[in-house]
Amino acid sequence: MGRSKSFGVIVLTILLLVTAAVNAAEKPFVEIDIYSVNDFHGHLRAEAADPGMAALAGAVSELMKQNPEGALLVGAGDMFSGTIDANEYQGQPVVIAMNKMGFAANAAGNHIFDYPLEIIKKQAAAAEFPLLGANILTAAGDKVAEPFRPYTMLQKQGLTIGIIGLTTLETRDKASQTNLQKVKILPPEEVAQSYIDELRNKGAQIIVLLTHIGSSQGEKTAVEGEIIPLLQKIQGVDAVITGHSHLCVSGEYNKIPIVQAGCYGEAVGRIHLLYSRADKRVVAAGARVYKLDQLPKVQDAAMEKLLAPIFKDIDARYNAVLALNDQLLTNDRNGESRVGDYFMDLLKSGFKADAALYNGGAVRADLPAGTVTMRDLIKIFPFDSTIYVGEVQGSDLRQVLEHGIGNPNISRLRFAGLQVTADTGEPEGQRISRILLADGSVLADEKYYKVVSNDFMFSGGDGFASLKNAQNLRACGKANTFFAFALRSFKTINYPAADDRLQIKN
């Protein structure tokens, strides 16, 4: 009698599963919701304006309950690095947290190459989702570089969804040049259409571009940015997820929904697709961004428990006080940065250089008033570059300033030891009208100057190609090691609110 009852339960279960599958297949319309996070940059813990991963996980979980059978979650790149919590463990805490949230895929961003390829392979091995980068090839250019995959295919509501991963061509300039040596970044348009066609031939009914490619949008304007020229050259895409520009975008191009969800876990993107089985295509679509501060706050307790030991370990090692700061020093990546000025002054004096230079994108946070800890320092300089000293000709130094000041494509150059007058309304090559050294002398194009900077800049990163001409380069250790030593030595920071190192006419 017991066996008969068990057999009956098994048969009933099978019938229910079959019936559910049939019902799903018979639905004339299917709703698919693709939720996305981009440019998280390792902001795992809640502090200041950052919601933290527990809040992000809670918000995503609640949103996905609206369509549990038809929802999926993806990442649009630059997830694994950018804070001490992530960097100290080579991105693994973010990977583990994303596993717990159930990410279905993650596109490779330019900052994936903050890590060497060997570390990226370890991240991919730990991830329960594929790391996508269809335009990231081996150095020989013969195939997609491991551990990246060009696309993934998955099933939702009886539909086959193909997701293609693409990264910005700006990765060539906005990533560690050393770590890029083993790969070749192709223009996305050179590979996108072939993979779209391949997925269609394999039966994909919905195709999504999961990209770390920039987009932007005014309050009432169409979507713009790097993603649009790509979309003008391809066809057959149903949805586009973007990243890289750290903006909230929800719009469309040629009726293709496009989304981007800010940065640091502040928001979640959503693309809603309505698929018609009769028409065998997406017949309606929309894009939306949910800001976490506008949603009911739901903390994921399991995520908090998962991350607590990591935070405890980091705090124990990096909360020691380095110095006391008299006043807040702010950082505007596209404008003035007294933080950048202060640390460039430390570099110039510490290495007895004529000038100190730093790419503005490497300076990421304010320096708070009061106690300054190693955690604070790493928030400012999360990528911990290597310091280099070299001899740079005046004409090349002038070109660095022309490229780094008033350039809308990169964060403003940080420097010390120079007094510069610039007209940012002029094109590159005509912006700088005066450059004085600390002794009041005018920069001489033919003369060589002692310059201290970082490995990223001396290797031509961010387009600072003229620095590749530097002579007698020598490595001088990690930047954060030097900065921490300097702060401990001075013990107090009393830095003026402004100076005249940069005078802008326009």
Q: Model segments located where?
A:
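Bacterial N-terminal signal peptides that target proteins for export
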Residues: 1-11
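Acidic, metal/ion-coordinating pockets
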Residues: 24-312, 334-349, 356, 371, ...
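Charge-dense polyanion-binding interfaces
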Residues: 409-437
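A hydrophobic, small-residue-rich beta->alpha segment in the mid-to-C-terminal subdomain
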Residues: 443-489
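A glycine-rich phosphate-binding loop feature that marks nucleotide/adenosyl-phosphate handling sites
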Residues: 288-291, 324-329, 357-367, 415-426, ...
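Flexible, polar/acidic helix-loop-strand segments at domain edges
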Residues: 365-392, 396-404
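Glycine-rich phosphate/diphosphate-binding loops and the adjacent beta-loop-alpha structural elements
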Residues: 317-336
